[in-house]
């Protein structure tokens, strides 16, 4: 018989840098989860993705054990890294914050495909292109 899930916690943490300080400690502590065990396991799973923010979904079971799934970095983070900018434009309709090539767009779409609700690279590219345009990042051929 499967264990009963009592809580689902979603956090976005720096890869390889989870520690018991907020937001991790309070989020897990209120459900009675071993915080250090989570931090060690998360850091070991994400150490190869240093520099990225990695979203994580933690399932807490009734016996206070847990399991978690790491996701791919947010599209906005991948776009800003590819464009070489600190952040997107505050007014995307007026000014451009930077640009990325279609090959970079395709690479980001391939990275994000498992987490997107689409099945083909072409549709994933359209989703990522929309995110880029909202950030004021243009797509160059």
From Swiss-Prot:
Q: Cite the Pfam families for this sequence.
A: Ribosomal_L11, Ribosomal_L11_N
Coiled coil stretches, renumbered? none
Mind telling me how this protein is modified after translation?
One or more lysine residues are methylated.
Q: InterPro entries attached here?
A: Ribosomal_uL11, Ribosomal_uL11_bac-typ, Ribosomal_uL11_C, Ribosomal_uL11_C_sf, Ribosomal_uL11_CS, Ribosomal_uL11_N, Ribosomal_uL11_N_sf
Question: Taxonomically, which superkingdom?
Answer: Bacteria
Q: Name one GO biological process term.
A: translation
Summary of the function given for this chain in its UniProt record: Forms part of the ribosomal stalk which helps the ribosome interact with GTP-bound translation factors.
State how it assembles.
Part of the ribosomal stalk of the 50S ribosomal subunit. Interacts with L10 and the large rRNA to form the base of the stalk. L10 forms an elongated spine to which L12 dimers bind in a sequential fashion forming a multimeric L10(L12)X complex.
Q: Which PANTHER family match?
A: 60S RIBOSOMAL PROTEIN L12, LARGE RIBOSOMAL SUBUNIT PROTEIN UL11M
Query: Which family does the record claim for this protein?
Result: Belongs to the universal ribosomal protein uL11 family.
Protein's name according to its UniProt entry: Large ribosomal subunit protein uL11
Origin species: Prochlorococcus marinus (strain NATL2A)
Q: Which gene encodes it?
A: rplK
């Amino acid at each position: 018989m499967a264990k009963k899930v009592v809580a689902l916690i979603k956090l976005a943490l720096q890869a390889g840098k989870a520690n018991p300080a907020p937001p991790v400690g309070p989020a897990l502590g209120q459900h009675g989860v071993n915080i250090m065990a989570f931090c060690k396991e998360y850091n070991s799973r994400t150490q190869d993705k240093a520099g990225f923010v990695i979203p994580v979904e933690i399932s807490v079971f009734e016996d206070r054990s847990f399991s978690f799934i790491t996701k791919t970095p947010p599209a906005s983070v991948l776009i800003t890294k590819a464009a070489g900018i600190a952040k997107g434009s505050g007014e995307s309709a007026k000014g451009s914050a930077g640009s990325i090539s279609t090959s970079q767009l395709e690479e980001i779409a391939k990275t994000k495909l498992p987490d997107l609700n689409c099945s083909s690279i072409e549709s994933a590219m359209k989703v990522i292109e929309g995110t880029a345009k909202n950030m004021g990042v243009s797509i160059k051929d």
